[in-house]
Amino acid sequence: MIPEILKLSIIGYDRVIYQGEAEFVVLPTQWGEMGVLPGHTKTFALLKPGKIRVKNKGSEEIFTVKEGVIKVKPDEVEVLSA
């Protein structure tokens, strides 16, 4: 069963940048931008400096991040940024 929403955590070196839900997330990776919807295949990726776009309930939030790592599961995205 495909989940309807993603749990998203963006963790910086010394603080939680964002923790909540998302319908769609766009992440800057070593391969270019990666879009993640609920039900996405499990994957790890390297985070490149850039902007993470989080879409939820008709609004969009943008977070500027440095390098780090991304872990994606069908119902969850975890971002660790330097």
Predicted regions and their residues:
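Compact, glycine-rich, soluble single-domain proteins
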Residues: 6-82
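Short, charged, intrinsically disordered terminal tails
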Residues: 1-5
